Amino acid sequence: MTAPPETAPTDAELLAASVRDGDRFTAVYDRHYAGVHRYVAGRLGPQAADDVVAETFLTAFRRRAAFDPSRGDVRPWLFGIATNLIAQHRRTETRRYRVLAKVGADRDPGGHDDRVAASVSAERLQPSLARALAALSRKDRDVVLLKALAQLTHEEIADVLGIPYGTVGSRLSRARRKLRAALPAPTEGL
């Protein structure tokens, strides 16, 4: 008989092990860095994201002994730390949305193929979307961006923000309704 295959340790197990051996935290970092970075970059822009993500993982490392797995998983805990740090950088985020609403997003100076591949309708929509996001309340914007950028589940968003599961659905529904009302209707053929 062969032994059953070993399963990879869970995030909570790695975090607990990292209390005794700090090097074990590297696995948590490796598993979640890209997702946290994508979320923060979408909120604050790529330049601020590097600093905020570094601060997120430094905070998580410092608080790893206090992590309580009975209150939720490591992934939403990390996104909660990131969301709290984003709140400290909120003025930058709001300014960014206002600038995007006025001038559109920075154009990627990529090659000709990249420019051709860019969707005309997305380019046209970006200032309107930025304006609509800036108009949402902070609470509604947090839920929308945790869903859209971090791709968290309703349950994970509830854990991150410390709100009931049903409130996530209510805020998301309200925010989507406001965004739909604020955005131009899709145009046929684009």
Language-model features and meaning:
Residues 32, 128, 171-174, 178:
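Residues within the DNA-recognition helix of helix-turn-helix
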Residues 13-16, 128-136, 182:
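Short amphipathic alpha-helical boundary/capping segments
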